[in-house]
């Protein structure tokens, strides 16, 4: 399935995807899938991002904020994310072009709206668990069918009004769970083979290198610059996904 040219291509794509994630905290699966699907099928592309997404988010999860505290706050989202990932992967077996197009439109629209409207949307504490469950269900469905979990998971976490460090750890925990659930869902639907697992694991290496370089730049950003970078990445990712779908 993979020759030397394909391996080189995968390395370059995941190096760039890792760099994007290092600077903004998100984007590795979406960026990688957007480019990979230009050269190979979406089913292969989705399978390849599982291990890089899982391992890079594991690295990002550890920081100054206690993980247990984040899990307690996010558990409704994580539960429904798990359940609906299987439904989304079932859709991937058949057809996911429309969902992919919709995903790209929503991402770009939200990013553009948030940049133009300076006031950040903030979710009140009393609505967090309900909206977390709804977001998890939607994220699992989109992620399982397109391999891209950034909508609406990143948008939900961003709306919780966290510090930069809290956001990075929280989104990493959510996305590491999403990658793990995606792997289970793909396996259950016979979309993940041992060969794809091996190449997906290899793809984590250039992802880590790119992420390391990106994190060196990230720590030089202040909160406002970081948020602008994050929102700009949402727009770019959305446009890439739209291009992939049409």
Predicted regions and their residues:
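Transmembrane helix exit motif
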Residues: 59-66, 89, 93, 97, ...
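Cytoplasmic-side transmembrane-helix entry/capping segments in multi-pass membrane proteins
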Residues: 70-80, 100-106, 126-136, 166-173, ...
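Selective hydrophobic functional segments
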Residues: 48-97, 180-224
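Structural signature of hydrophobic alpha-helical transmembrane segments
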Residues: 6-7, 37-54, 98-107, 137-147, ...
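Hydrophobic alpha-helical transmembrane segments in multi-pass integral membrane proteins
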Residues: 45, 87-88, 140-148, 182-185, ...
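Selected transmembrane alpha-helices and immediately adjacent juxtamembrane segments
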Residues: 1-39, 121-171, 178
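Residues within membrane-spanning alpha-helices of integral membrane proteins
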Residues: 11, 50, 104-107, 111, ...
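Juxtamembrane helix-boundary/capping and inter-helix hinge elements in multi-pass membrane proteins
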Residues: 38-43, 64-70, 158-166, 189-193
